[in-house]
Amino acid sequence: MNLGKVDLINGSITSSMLRFALPLMLGNLLQQCYNIADTLIVGRVLGAEALAAVGSSYALIVFVTSVFIGLSMGCSAVFSMQYGAGDMEGLRQSIFSSVLLVGGVTVLLNVSSLLFLSPIIELLQTPGELQGLVYDYLFIVFLGMIPVCIYNFYAFLLRSVGNSFAPLIFLAISVVLNIVLDVIMMVSFGMGVEGTALATVISQITGSVGLWIYTNRNFPELCLHRKDCVFSGRSLRRITSFSFLTAVQQSVMNFGILMVQGLVNSFGTAVMAAFAAAVKIDSFTYMPVQDFGNAFSTFIAQNFGAGRKERIRNGIRSAVYITTVFSLFVSFLVFCLSPWLMAFFVSPTETEIIEIGVEYLRIEGSFYIGIGFLFLLYGYYRAVALPSMSVVLTVVSLGTRVVLAYVLASIPSVGYTGIWWSVPIGWALADIVGFWYYRTRLKDSSLVG
């Protein structure tokens, strides 16, 4: 059964983008709900130290997974263009080249992460009393990285041809299983952080295998035949050029976050715990504009491949309007509800942690429109075969964030509050650069019509 395929080349622009984006949003919502449930269980059952350990591990996990997610995302841009152009033979050849590239890099990265885990934990300035917990948690999670790669590759493949619903179904299965196993492992068996890591790995294997089987049964046009499995240097170079730059973008983004995590760690367990909870809330609240940016990218790429330039222009206008309205609404909610949101994660008696988290959310949450526009810019440049501009914008955003965070945090009167302020400033500078490039170089060029 072909679940939820959306035609992005014909019909209503706003409706098609929203219908395609909705499963992406729901999928990320499910993932964030799991993250919240996981944080809640760890914080309430295992305590502040375990919460700090798992929370500080999050940045490293995201950094490692961002490499093969970035590779798969870059591949999907090529897939979307070829699908929009009706080149199914070229699409299958690109899929084979992508399997070689993404699979090889994933295995290499997974082995390296396990071998160098201890020095990486020390490099992140993890407090001595937490290093053992962090190592135990990360070692198990990294053992299960390959299933994560498989799921994301097939999810991006299906999304590139307009199906964002099937990945949602298998993600939902994985998330529900993960939460159930979390409770069993930590509450019933008393396994600690190792239990939540093991639950994560088991659920990821289930979701990835399910999506792989579904794709092979329901999308025969995407299945590789012997004639497709022929090495093509041209195809591999094209895939690599897109995927490498997108992976660099994702890696730079998350490496910057990793450096910020190291700075946060230097302020002690209370700030670490507040940051861990606040980041989960933060990512939950701006997640819809991130997913809409990814849907927008697929829309642009398919229409770019099909030569529908006027439709691209109209799509840009619709996307900017939707992002603006949603971002302002969410910023208002987060500013008003941040004390309640923080109290949901930690005990009401942990007043210091709650106050730190509220400060973070009110500073960063007031400027979600900045990250909303940035996600549109990332998606647009990736879709029109300019992934290098996405890298430039990421370097501007994260470079500003990291440098400002370290500079401001070193001022005694500012302290860790400077880390929070560095984020929206980085977003704003990257938005300015991205809009300037579009207005001066691309808006009236033959690239977009």
Region roles according to the model:
Residues L8-L46, A59-G74, V78, G103-N110, ...:
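N-terminal transmembrane alpha-helices
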